[in-house]
């Protein structure tokens, strides 16, 4: 975190749970979490440790929480939605101020749900009950920016290459884009006649993929490449989210 601050970054977003369903905090909702690992003899809490480090060094803290969970046996049922809302509540309650909550638009598909290989489909527009999610966030973290394909706080830019359109409006037409249903070109440029303020966020990895592999350490982006990404994201009226 000290390195992030020295690099001039404004905030850190931690992937608290990705699609695999493993939780980096000692959640009380599932055994599939850091509590049941050798890390710090089962007493570790990476979410808590990072939140504390961000507070120490004066940088904003945020979390990514995947709606899709390829581990939970009840994914695709109403019971899972309740579970997901409770996960969100834990994260929004126990770790101080959160400046952004990041919801991935990848939802439904193949997984090992409850240990059985299966494929699940959902109604992406209605399944997660986003109105209820927004109520939880308004109550527990009213200042938090909500990221998804369509906002409402900020939107995905429609690609994972780290750049926005040369013309990139901060508006969307309300109701035309929603989480899990991206309109790639429209997200890249926004709507000039939009009536909802939803600025774009450009996500890109500093290495070839999203996850760490030691053999890729000599393939990280160069200063020249990163500078170009900065100009094509921040310089195109968007924020830049750089994955490490």
Where are these regions (language model features)?
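Mature catalytic domains of secreted/periplasmic carbohydrate-active enzymes
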Residues: 1-244
């Amino acid at each position: 975190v000290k390195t992030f601050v020295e690099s001039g970054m404004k905030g850190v977003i931690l992937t608290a749970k990705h699609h695999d369903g493993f939780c980096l905090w000692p959640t009380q909702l599932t055994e599939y979490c850091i509590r049941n690992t050798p890390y710090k003899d089962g007493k570790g809490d990476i979410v808590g440790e990072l939140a504390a480090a961000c507070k120490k060094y004066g940088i904003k803290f945020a979390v990514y929480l995947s709606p899709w969970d390829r581990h939970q046996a009840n994914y695709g049922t109403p019971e899972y939605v309740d579970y997901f809302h409770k996960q969100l509540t834990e994260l929004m309650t126990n770790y101080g101020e959160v400046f952004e909550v990041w919801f991935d638009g990848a939802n439904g598909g193949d997984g090992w749900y409850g240990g059985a290989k299966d494929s699940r489909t959902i109604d992406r527009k209605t399944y997660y009950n986003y109105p209820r999610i927004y109520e939880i966030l308004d109550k527990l973290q009213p200042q938090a920016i909500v990221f998804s394909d369509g906002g409402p706080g900020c939107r995905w830019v429609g690609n994972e290459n780290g750049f926005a359109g040369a013309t990139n409006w901060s508006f969307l037409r309300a109701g035309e884009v929603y989480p899990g249903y991206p309109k790639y070109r429209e997200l890249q440029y926004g709507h000039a006649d939009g009536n909802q303020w939803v600025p774009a966020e450009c996500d890109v990895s500093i290495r070839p993929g999203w996850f760490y592999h030691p053999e890729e350490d000599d393939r990280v982006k160069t200063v020249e490449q990163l500078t170009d990404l900065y100009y094509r994201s921040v310089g195109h009226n968007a924020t830049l989210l750089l994955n490490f």
